[in-house]
Swiss-Prot record:
This is ATP synthase epsilon chain. It is found in: Cell inner membrane. The gene is atpC. CDD domains: F1-ATPase_delta. It comes from Blochmanniella pennsylvanica (strain BPEN). It holds the Pfam family ATP-synt_DE_N. InterPro entries: ATP_F1_dsu/esu_C_sf, ATP_synth_F1_dsu/esu, ATP_synth_F1_dsu/esu_N, ATP_synth_F1_esu_C, ATPsynth_dsu/esu_N. HAMAP family: ATP_synth_epsil_bac. F-type ATPases have 2 components, CF(1) - the catalytic core - and CF(0) - the membrane proton channel. CF(1) has five subunits: alpha(3), beta(3), gamma(1), delta(1), epsilon(1). CF(0) has three main subunits: a, b and c.
Length: 144
């Protein structure tokens, strides 16, 4: 492993989804988008639902949907413990669009029944948008 890389492991409750040497990653933290480069300061933080962008050697990129979880950065090792982690090819675009549409419909009909309901609906929208973004990025990356 060179000075310009580090080892990344992405695991979910179901399985290990990625393990290997990378140049950098980009993920959505609780404070917003963050990049992790070699030599990053040690860190432990929560991550929000979104797309994990992995840049491997020779600038090859891979994208994974993360539904939230924990990011741990150590000296030469980064670990993501995800609630759910899904590769783009495992997603169903039609189902993701339907989920987004249903959540948007619920939010339009929201009548202050409960703050928890509102939080769940907005979370569902965020997850559906992230899945659709992942599929879009993967398609775009194939044609480059």
């Amino acid at each position: 492993m060179s000075e310009c890389t580090y080892y990344l492991t992405v695991v979910s409750v179901e399985r290990e989804i990625f393990s290997g040497v990378v140049r950098k990653i980009q993920v959505t933290g609780i404070e917003g988008e963050m990049g992790v480069f070699p030599g990053h300061t040690p860190l432990l933080t929560s991550i929000k639902p979104g797309v994990l962008r992995i840049v491997k050697s020779h600038d090859n990129e891979e994208y994974i949907y993360i539904s939230g979880g924990i990011l741990e950065v150590q000296r030469n090792i980064v670990t993501i413990l995800a609630d759910t982690a899904i590769r783009a090819e495992e997603l169903d675009e039609k189902k993701a669009k339907e989920a987004k549409h249903e959540a948007e419909k619920h939010i339009k009909n929201y009548r202050h029944s409960s703050d928890i309901d509102y939080i769940k609906i907005t979370s569902d929208i965020s997850k559906a948008i992230a899945k659709l973004r992942l599929m879009e990025l993967t398609k775009k990356n194939k044609y480059m």
